[in-house]
Amino acid sequence: HNTSHKFESTFLSLQIPENNSVMLSSLSGNKLGIWVAHGEGKFSLPEEESKYNVVAKYNYAAYPGNPNGSDYNVAGICSKDGRHLAMMPHLERAIFPWQNAWYPLDRRADEVTPWIEAFVNARKWVEEKMK
């Protein structure tokens, strides 16, 4: 459960560190806006942070910037090989600029947000494996 013991729904930004995730590696180095909407989104990580393949982090460690109270302000982790992603924020709810609570004025003409890359990367990975 979230540390707040309630359902959290908010728009905030994530940092995408260097990573080997099939879906998120091409977004490394970005800060992107995204929706959070869950009551049970807390990552409880008993080991030290270096033991996990962290692929997305909330920009802040404390509430409300880390709305669920996840250890190490983790928003997403991945398997060592990069194939399996576990992510609490909803990137599928931030694909189009009109879905975002805030989007840069100079990018308002975009048809899609950078989050679409995650799904394009997954599709390309599957297509490559099907050859």
Per-region residue spans from a language model:
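Amide-donor transfer/coupling interface in amidating biosynthetic enzymes
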Residues: 1-131
